[in-house]
Amino acid sequence: MKGILSEIGRLNHIAIAVPNIQKASSIWENALGAKISLAQSLPEHGVKVVFIESPNTKVELLEPLNKQSPINKFLERNPNGGMHHMCYEVSNLENATKKQQCQ
């Protein structure tokens, strides 16, 4: 059986947890001239998000909406923020999941 790498496509986005999404967005916009999406609250995930567009991928900034948010727990361990996850595209999610579970 081939490993999980045979299922992985391109990098879709990198997610960075931040304590203040407005401040972090401003840094990306002013320092890099990045195009920033409008902030969206996703209560079902406990976060507010913005996407920073780049030619080959996206960066997702995540700010917790409340103390119960998993991002809040991440920021308790990493008060200045940091990389939370990377998201890769796969051609077949079911196959990729099975291969990952076998490893």
Language model features with spans:
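N-terminal mitochondrial targeting presequence
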Residues: 1-4
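Helix-adjacent hinge/juxtasegments
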Residues: 58-84
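Mid-chain, well-packed structural core segment of small domains
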Residues: 75, 79-103
